[in-house]
Swiss-Prot record:
One of its GO terms (molecular function) is gamma-guanidinobutyraldehyde dehydrogenase (NAD+) activity. It comes from the Eukaryota. Dehydrogenase that catalyzes the oxidation of several aminoaldehydes. Metabolizes and detoxifies aldehyde products of polyamine degradation to non-toxic amino acids. Catalyzes the oxidation of 4-aminobutanal and 3-aminopropanal to 4-aminobutanoate and beta-alanine, respectively. Production of 4-aminobutinoate by ALDH10A8 may confer tolerance to salt stress. Catalyzes the oxidation of 4-(trimethylamino)butanal and 4-guanidinobutanal to 4-trimethylammoniobutanoate and 4-guanidinobutanoate, respectively. Involved in glycine betaine biosynthesis. Na(+) binds at residues 99, 189. Widely expressed. This is Aminoaldehyde dehydrogenase ALDH10A8, chloroplastic. It is an enzyme of class 1 (oxidoreductase). InterPro entries: Ald_DH/histidinol_DH (IPR016161), Ald_DH_C (IPR016163), Ald_DH_CS_CYS (IPR016160), Ald_DH_CS_GLU (IPR029510), Ald_DH_N (IPR016162), Aldehyde_DH_dom (IPR015590). Optimum pH is 10.75 with 4-aminobutanal as substrate. Optimum pH is 10.5 with 3-aminopropanal as substrate. Pathway: Amine and polyamine biosynthesis; betaine biosynthesis via choline pathway; betaine from betaine aldehyde: step 1/1. It is found in: Cytoplasm; Plastid, Chloroplast. Belongs to the aldehyde dehydrogenase family. SUPFAM superfamilies: ALDH-like.
Length: 501
């Protein structure tokens, strides 16, 4: 059952504020192409106000209200937010499905992870105080040294539309746990649940200015946030092209950044596997979240001895995927997020065909859906490594298949990419899986599966997929600075210079 879209303003300094220029952006339901609401559009002027609010929150009461408060104080707020997310889970999931086209079952799963992420970082916030003043072993007895971990300050968090609330919370939860104050700028294509997070923060009494939520276009809100002198760090998830612009802006002030960018991840299937199990993982690894996954294993490498039979199974499994309005029960593939993305993906498929690839299955709009940005699950064969479809991130339900003859060839093909976010191998040979895991040029490796993600484990890439790690203890470290404190403990003078006495 549908749910009305709330009408919200920007969330700044603990209250709703109309954008200074009073601009708004329509919300389009990607399943129907209908306008179902709107969101506020922040501009440079609003960014200034939000940054000032975050800086005040950081230093209020000499930092004792937030940045220097005991970790248990921050943990209390994070747990309260988690409880409210659980309370509102059904409505949040429905809003997410309407806003970005994610199947409702997936959106519900995401909300469970959102609450779990806040709870996990509440525990880490609580444990942070006990880790302060960690001693450092020194070679000289006349000195003692210890380490302080302190919040970086005001952080700008720029997040994508494929996991609108979850990937925002991957940044919000650890940054607040660390004692930072934050300005969240979600994608203009899917911001609704991030504004609902702001409402939850208001409900639980989060101190004003600790979290500010600015919706709007990247050029009008994201860019001024990245370059703002009052922001101490930028954490970004999005495309390589936009990420490089964010880095350039941050570099002018030597501002630290962490980047989770695009991917073109490989999945290698050997000839010793259960073909049906492997086929399901291959499709899940590419078609989950409507194919809009930065870590999607969209380059499938199949051992030549099983290729024909395996590809046949892929097609059979693909035909069994329910493509529908994401609110329908049992939907497993919804629409892509926008008309622009829809047209971009179809252009990728068209170019692949013109370059000589075979569109074995899918490649167009499903016949039973006249409206909405729907694309059939698409399987492409006869691909060469020089083709655009093999080398560039599509960000849609498009799986490319190549064969290999040997383990060495599979590794070479897998690593032949500018990207290095995820990689997967399916084989019953444990030693082979270990060898390939070490050989993969990627930040995340899956064995006999694809795409599972846990709050406790690090997430991030290498090469053009970015740097820095989110989630786990590594996610908290993203928002902490390390300070060395060294004490001279001897009563004797230092004695380097000759005393005038």
């Amino acid at each position: 059952m549908a749910i009305p879209m709330p009408t919200r303003q920007l969330f700044i300094d603990g209250e709703w504020r109309e954008p200074i220029l009073k601009k708004r952006i329509p919300i389009v339901n990607p399943a129907t192409e209908e306008v179902i609401g709107d969101i506020p559009a922040a501009t440079t002027e609003d960014v200034d106000v939000a940054v000032n609010a975050a800086r005040r929150a950081l230093s209020r009461n000499k930092g004792k209200d937030w940045a220097k408060a005991p970790g248990a104080v921050r943990a209390k707020y994070l747990r309260a937010i988690a409880a409210k997310v659980n309370e509102r889970k059904t409505d949040l999931a429905k809003l997410e499905a309407l806003d970005c086209g994610k199947p409702l079952d997936e959106a519900v799963w995401d909300m469970d992870d959102v609450a779990g992420c806040f709870e996990f970082y509440a525990d880490l916030a609580e444990g942070l105080d006990a880790k302060q003043k960690a001693p450092v072993s020194l070679p000289m007895e006349s000195f003692k040294s210890y380490v302080l971990k302190q919040p970086l300050g005001v952080v700008g968090l720029i997040t994508p539309w494929n996991y609108p609330l979850l990937m925002a919370v991957w940044k919000v939860a650890p940054s607040l746990a660390a004692g930072c104050t934050a300005i969240l700028k979600p994608s203009e294509l899917a911001s609704v649940t991030c504004l609902e997070l702001a409402d939850i923060c208001r409900e639980v009494g989060l101190p004003p200015g600790v979290l500010n939520v600015l919706t709007g276009f990247g050029s009008e809100a994201g860019a001024p946030l990245a370059s703002h002198p009052g922001v101490d760090k930028i954490a970004f998830t999005g495309s390589f092209a936009t990420g490089s612009k964010v880095m350039t802006a941050a570099a002018q002030l030597v501002k630290p950044v962490s980047m989770e960018l695009g991917g073109k991840s490989p999945l290698i299937v050997f000839d010793d596997v259960d073909l049906d199990k492997a086929a399901e993982w291959a499709l899940f690894g590419c078609f989950w979240t409507n194919g809009q996954i930065c870590s999607a294993t969209s380059r499938l490498l199949v051992h030549e001895s099983i290729a024909s039979e395996f590809i046949e199974k892929l097609v059979k499994w693909s035909k069994n995927i329910k493509i529908s309005d994401p609110m329908e029960e049992g939907c497993r593939l919804g629409p892509v997020v926008s008309k622009g993305q829809y047209e971009k993906i179809l252009k990728f498929i068209s170019t692949a065909k013109s370059e000589g690839a075979t569109i074995l299955h899918g490649g167009s709009r499903p016949e039973h859906l006249e409206k909405g940005f729907f694309i059939e699950p698409t399987i492409i064969t006869d691909v060469t490594t020089s083709m655009q479809i093999w080398r560039e991130e599509v960000f849609g339900p498009v799986l490319c298949v190549k064969t290999f003859a040997s383990e060495d060839e599979a590794i070479e093909l897998a690593n032949d990419s500018h990207y290095g976010l995820g990689a997967a191998v399916i084989s019953n040979d444990t030693e082979r899986c270990d060898r390939i895991s070490e050989a993969f040029e990627a930040g995340i490796v899956w064995i006999n599966c694809s795409q599972p993600c846990f709050t406790q484990a690090p997430w991030g890439g290498v090469k053009r997929s970015g740097f820095g790690r989110e989630l786990g203890e590594w996610g908290l470290d993203n928002y902490l600075s390390v300070k060395q404190v060294t004490l001279y403990t001897s009563n004797d003078p230092w004695g380097w210079y000759k005393s005038p006495n």
